[in-house]
């Protein structure tokens, strides 16, 4: 292979997945447009010789820093056969990935980006083996280290009964599968396929699980032979030889259980079109008796997954739904049926017109507010003033002209009778409304207004009367007092309450004068 702009070396031998030819374009090939920029960045990050150019950020999951932007742009231009490439053009291409949720810029740090690993799925090549040489597949997310394996080995040829045993981990299960791994062909394990010491690490990290013999021999004979499955789990953190890997520390410590292997956060739990278990027959989760997780380990793992995703402002990853796998709920999620710890207090609606009138009338009863005349103390006996009132009215009627004497005398008599009946009875349920006669002379109008100002606040109102709306008070007064009704028919009767009605009385008196 030419040592041109292609950085990834094509793996030799039968081990590993054989990628298509366009993934290994040489310098002479025009454009090499099949590779994407984020694939190229992952290739640079996996190469030891480019640590001075681009490297993972220590202590941050999926974060990398471009140490030499011009050199990265030059390498990218050489790969794409574009010698005019610079970092401005490359950064525009990186900004395109922001909307695609492939990576995003780290705020506050120059030339620092972070991959969204839960968004990087493998739609094209679900059968992937990551060799220790650091080969990164063209459409796959990055994995923790180059030493970890993720592949589907062929069927164990030494099985005596020929039944499907997906749970057996042996030396043959450590072999790498080719593109024909889903076919019935078997091949022997080559010692060169295994790295030095990696097999012993895997044997130490895995426990043997019981084989499923529940299937009958006759039924197995008609089934298609399927390969064993090496679970997409990763070895202990102590086995990671790469000091530059951001995944050197697993969030879950190793615990005793069926699988004594900590789960790496690089394993995306987003269900994809091609999941890691291609069919129900190949799935290791089909039977709870064959495969089970430690609930405590799963709880810690899912909690760390959710917390890391929530910190990145991403949607949480959903665990694939398998019937035999019991996943405990997250502690950080609140169930909708649980009552909220904060009680919701509803405020009353704003007071309408009637409620406002009730409040105003209550305030007037408390304050003892009076019309625009001189303020008077709220509690004054009104009997002397009312006894003096008929005499003053008689004196005023004597000084009138002859043409109005009869009408005024009749009016004064009816007022005296109304006042006499008002004080003969106990205090009614409605506030007493004083009746004034519109006089022709302005002096008499002032006397009436003074008497009215003394009379009105003197009558104590009950609490229920203060709360009663004015319309209801008028209606009750109208229904209980037939004399007032007769006076109103003649057009000479006016209610003399507080507010505009009192002003109307004064205006009528001035008009008669």
Curated annotation (Swiss-Prot):
Main location: nucleus
Chain positions found as N6-acetyllysine: 388
A Gene Ontology molecular function term of the record: DEAD/H-box RNA helicase binding
GO biological process, alphabetically ordered: cellular response to granulocyte macrophage colony-stimulating factor stimulus; negative regulation of cell population proliferation; negative regulation of transcription by RNA polymerase II
TM spans (from-to): none
Biased composition (Polar residues): 430-439
Positions bearing Phosphoserine: 139, 159, 315
Crosslink site: Glycyl lysine isopeptide (Lys-Gly) (interchain with G-Cter in SUMO2): 381, 388
Acidic residues biased stretches: 441-450
Keyword terms of this UniProt record: Acetylation, DNA-binding, Isopeptide bond, Nucleus, Phosphoprotein, Repressor, Transcription, Transcription regulation, Ubl conjugation
SMART domains named in the record: ETS
Any single GO CC term annotated in Swiss-Prot or TrEMBL for this entry: RNA polymerase II transcription repressor complex
Positions with biased composition (Low complexity): 504-513
DNA-binding region: 35-116
Localization (cell): Nucleus
Bias kind Basic and acidic residues: ranges: 357-366, 380-392, 399-419, 451-466, 477-489
InterPro entries referenced in this protein's UniProt entry, alphabetically: Ets_dom, ETS_fam, WH-like_DNA-bd_sf, WH_DNA-bd_sf
Disordered, as annotated region: 138-202, 333-513
Similarity remark: Belongs to the ETS family.
Function: Transcriptional repressor that contribute to growth arrest during terminal macrophage differentiation by repressing target genes involved in Ras-dependent proliferation. Represses MMP1 promoter activity.
Protein name from the UniProt record: ETS translocation variant 3
């Amino acid at each position: 292979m030419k040592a041109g702009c292609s950085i990834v070396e094509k793996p030799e031998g039968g081990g590993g997945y054989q990628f298509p030819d366009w993934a290994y374009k040489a310098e002479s090939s025009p454009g090499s447009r099949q590779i994407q920029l984020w694939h190229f960045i992952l290739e640079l990050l996996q190469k030891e010789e480019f640590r001075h150019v681009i490297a993972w950020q220590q202590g941050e999951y999926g974060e990398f820093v471009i140490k030499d932007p011009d050199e990265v742009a030059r390498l990218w231009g050489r790969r794409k056969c574009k010698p005019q490439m610079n970092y401005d053009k490359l950064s525009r291409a990186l900004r395109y990935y922001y909307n695609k949720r492939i990576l995003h810029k780290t705020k506050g740090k120059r030339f620092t980006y972070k991959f969204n690993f839960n968004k990087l799925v493998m739609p094209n090549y679900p059968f992937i083996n990551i060799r220790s040489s650091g080969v990164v597949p063209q459409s796959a997310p990055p994995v923790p280290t180059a030493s970890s394996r993720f592949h589907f080995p062929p069927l164990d040829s030494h099985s005596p009964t020929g039944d499907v045993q997906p749970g057996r981990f042996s030396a043959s299960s450590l072999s790498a599968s080719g593109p024909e791994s889903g076919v019935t062909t078997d091949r022997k394990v080559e010692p060169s396929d295994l790295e030095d010491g990696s097999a012993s690490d895997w044997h130490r990290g895995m426990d043997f699980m019981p084989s499923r013999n529940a299937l009958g021999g006759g039924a197995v004979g008609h089934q298609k032979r399927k390969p064993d499955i090496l679970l997409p789990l990763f070895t202990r953190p102590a086995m990671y030889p790469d000091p530059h890997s951001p995944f050197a520390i697993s969030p879950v410590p190793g615990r005793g259980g069926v699988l004594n292997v900590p789960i790496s956060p690089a394993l995306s739990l987003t269900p994809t079109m091609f999941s890691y278990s291609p069919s129900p027959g190949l799935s290791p989760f089909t039977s709870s008796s064959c495969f089970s997780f430690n609930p405590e380990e799963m709880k810690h793992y899912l909690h760390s997954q959710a917390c890391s995703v929530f910190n990145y402002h991403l949607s949480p990853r959903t665990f694939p739904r398998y019937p035999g796998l019991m996943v405990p709920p997250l502690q950080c999620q609140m169930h909708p049926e649980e009552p909220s710890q904060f009680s919701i207090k509803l405020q009353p609606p704003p007071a309408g017109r009637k409620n406002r009138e009730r409040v105003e009338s209550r305030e007037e009863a408390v304050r003892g507010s009076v019309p625009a005349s001189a303020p008077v103390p709220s509690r004054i006996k009104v009997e002397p003033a009312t006894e003096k009132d008929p005499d003053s009215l008689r004196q005023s009627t004597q000084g009138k002209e002859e043409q109005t004497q009869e009408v005024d005398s009749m009016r004064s008599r009816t007022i005296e009778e109304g006042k006499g009946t008002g004080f003969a009875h106990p205090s009614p349920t409605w506030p007493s409304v004083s009746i004034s006669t519109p006089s022709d002379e302005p002096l008499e109008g002032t006397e009436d207004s003074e008497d009215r100002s003394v009379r009105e606040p003197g009558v104590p109102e009950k609490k229920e009367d203060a709360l009663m709306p004015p319309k209801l008070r008028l209606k009750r007064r109208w229904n209980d007092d037939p004399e007032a009704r007769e006076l109103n028919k003649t057009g000479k009767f006016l209610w003399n309450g507080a507010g505009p009605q009192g002003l109307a009385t004064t205006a009528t008196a001035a008009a008669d004068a």
